């Protein structure tokens, strides 16, 4: 936020604008088609699409064959999901998992069924689908003292499956907490002793990015690259995965060309040079929320919303004066294009596009014969967001140091993911009912969990950079002061609520009154992307290294045939 500096020789006060020193966009016009080279379907693309359909039919036969044993079916489903293909076979997978659920206790609950991989994998697959399967099924792998049997250590694939299953725990499931501790320790030991073993790639990846906390495109890109190494791999699945990944990538490239052209026409680089220019990173973020081609409309809408949110965040956080920020907050509350001229000129460049994007979404939904009430919910969420932005700006102006509790009461909203959750429902079609928006507006566990994960993950990795300019204290500084502890202790303590937040999110997904899974997945996917972008550093603000590599692997480089 800009501050006033008094001068005895000049005017009564002058405005000193802050600068955060954000690096410029690293992408330039990379994704904007030049001349007549707009992404068009070629004969090669058409052949690939035909090949895709043929391969899909082969896999569908594998899923519907009546003579396949249950162990093989759950392994097949796991591979399909890891390879990013499950959206092609949703009905078949739902039917199969319902059969697994119906026979679960009879099949896996007996002491005779002691295959750890089968039990843990089926548990994870069912929990992922919202089936509240009891974790007591793992007690048969414990000794009389309640400890996991050491003989399990030799079953590396089983240990890996138990590790992944443990990340679907809810509060009070001590057996899964013990399982996580047990498997983490022994899988790390396995890696140290067998760094080049075939399973080492899977183990290494899981320890860093458990499946429950990973987003689809990154999981698929990695698994496709190593799947051929494993004795259980199926060539038809690998061929389908490569074909599908590359075709979906072309869909994303075409959309990103449209998005970057829209962004370039807004000319924020010249009109608002103090703000982060991260539209490509925003699109990448939103492909983590929904990557499937059928979600093109919500993907474009949410990308525009998050891109403009980033600009407006920087107006509050870096550039605007207290008086200007009050004006902007009031204008957003009124949501009226007729007051555009009352704003400072630089703010108009962000205010008008904001209103335009929501109006565009509303018009498109009306043309499709869909109700538009979701846009109103998203507007209200955006208004609440900017109120917290202003609250933090006032803290900075007053040089106020909030308690940790005060800070979190505001910062859980200013992290913007509550607004993004609402906005993620807007273009989802008829499944996003008024009841779903009402449920979301009451801050359910899954949204609060997401907010905690976002805010604390961001603050832990980003607070030192923010402290290089005038900025409010982060959760780290507030916790240090409130509890009289060191920075390292604060980090450790703040990671505990993040762990609990994931459990909250898992719990919400098992509630019968929760909205349909396609809606819950949007909220959960926001947390998954955050888990990647804020891993070790702020990969959104500082996107020129690891984030660049991730974007390149998902949105630029096709997978070789």
From Swiss-Prot:
Binds 3 manganese or magnesium ions per subunit. GO terms for cellular component: cytoplasm. GO terms for molecular function: magnesium ion binding; terpene synthase activity. Mg(2+) 3 binds at residues 458, 466. Mg(2+) 1 binds at residues 313, 317. GO terms for biological process: diterpenoid biosynthetic process. It catalyses: (2E,6E)-farnesyl diphosphate + H2O = kunzeaol + diphosphate. Its cofactor is Mn(2+); Mg(2+). A motif (DDXXD motif) lies at residues 313-317. Mg(2+) 2 binds at residues 313, 317. It is an enzyme of class 4 (lyase). Pathway: Secondary metabolite biosynthesis; terpenoid biosynthesis. Keywords: Cytoplasm, Lyase, Magnesium, Manganese, Metal-binding. The Asp-Asp-Xaa-Xaa-Asp/Glu (DDXXD/E) motif is important for the catalytic activity, presumably through binding to Mg(2+). Belongs to the terpene synthase family. Tpsa subfamily. This is Sesquiterpene synthase 2. It comes from Thapsia garganica. The lineage of its organism: Eukaryota, Viridiplantae, Streptophyta, Embryophyta, Tracheophyta.
């Amino acid at each position: 936020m800009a501050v006033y500096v008094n001068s005895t020789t000049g005017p009564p006060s002058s405005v000193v604008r802050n600068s955060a020193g954000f690096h410029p966009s690293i992408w330039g016009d990379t994704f904007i088609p030049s001349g007549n080279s707009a992404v068009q379907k070629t004969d090669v693309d058409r052949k690939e699409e035909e090949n895709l359909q043929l391969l899909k039919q082969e896999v569908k036969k594998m899923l519907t064959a009546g003579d396949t044993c249950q162990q093989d079916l759950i392994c097949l489903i796991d591979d399909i999901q890891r390879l990013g293909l499950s959206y092609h076979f949703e009905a078949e997978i739902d039917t199969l998992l319902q059969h697994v659920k119906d026979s679960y206790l009879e099949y896996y609950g007996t002491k005779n069924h002691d295959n750890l991989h089968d039990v843990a994998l089926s548990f994870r697959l069912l929990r992922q689908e919202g089936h509240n399967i009891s974790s007591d099924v793992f007690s048969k792998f414990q000794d009389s003292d309640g400890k996991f049997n050491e003989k399990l250590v030799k079953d590396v694939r089983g240990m890996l499956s138990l590790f992944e299953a443990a990340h679907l725990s809810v509060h009070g499931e001590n057996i899964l907490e013990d399982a996580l501790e047990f498997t983490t320790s022994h899988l790390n030991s396995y890696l140290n002793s067998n760094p080049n073993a075939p399973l080492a790639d899977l183990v290494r990846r899981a320890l860093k990015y458990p499946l429950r906390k990973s987003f689809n495109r990154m999981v698929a890109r990695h698994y496709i690259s190593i799947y051929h190494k494993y004795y259980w791999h199926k060539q038809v699945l690998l061929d389908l995965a490569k074909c599908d990944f590359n075709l979906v990538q072309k869909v994303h490239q075409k959309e990103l060309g449209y998005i970057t052209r829209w962004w370039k026409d807004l000319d924020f680089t010249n009109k608002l040079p103090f703000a982060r220019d991260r539209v490509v990173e925003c699109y990448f973020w939103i492909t983590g929320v929904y990557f499937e081609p059928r979600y093109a409309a919500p993907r474009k809408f949410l990308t525009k919303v998050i891109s403009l949110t980033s600009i407006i965040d920087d107006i509050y956080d870096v550039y605007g004066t207290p008086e200007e920020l009050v004006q902007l907050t009031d204008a957003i509350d009124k949501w009226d294009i007729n007051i555009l001229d009352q704003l400072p000129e630089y703010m108009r460049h962000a205010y008008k596009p904001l209103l335009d994007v929501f109006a565009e979404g509303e018009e498109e939904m009306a043309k499709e014969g869909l109700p538009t009430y979701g846009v109103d919910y998203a507007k209200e969420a955006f208004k609440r967001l900017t109120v917290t932005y202003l609250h933090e700006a006032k803290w900075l102006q007053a040089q106020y140091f909030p308690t940790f509790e005060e800070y979190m009461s505001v910062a859980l909203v200013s992290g913007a993911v509550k607004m993004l959750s609402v906005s993620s429902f807007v273009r989802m079609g008829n499944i996003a009912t008024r009841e779903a928006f009402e449920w979301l507006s009451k801050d359910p566990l899954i949204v609060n969990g997401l907010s905690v994960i976002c805010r604390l993950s961001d603050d832990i990795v980003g607070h030192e950079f923010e402290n290089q300019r005038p900025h409010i204290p982060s959760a780290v500084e507030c916790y240090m002061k409130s509890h009289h502890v060191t920075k390292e202790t604060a980090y450790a303590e703040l990671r505990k609520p993040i762990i609990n937040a994931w459990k909250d999110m898992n719990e919400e997904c098992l509630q019968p009154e929760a909205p349909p899974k396609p809606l819950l997945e949007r909220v959960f996917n926001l947390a998954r992307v955050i888990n990647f972008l804020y891993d070790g550093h702020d990969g959104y603000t500082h996107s020129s290294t690891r984030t660049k590599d991730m974007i390149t692997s998902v949105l630029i480089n096709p997978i070789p045939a």
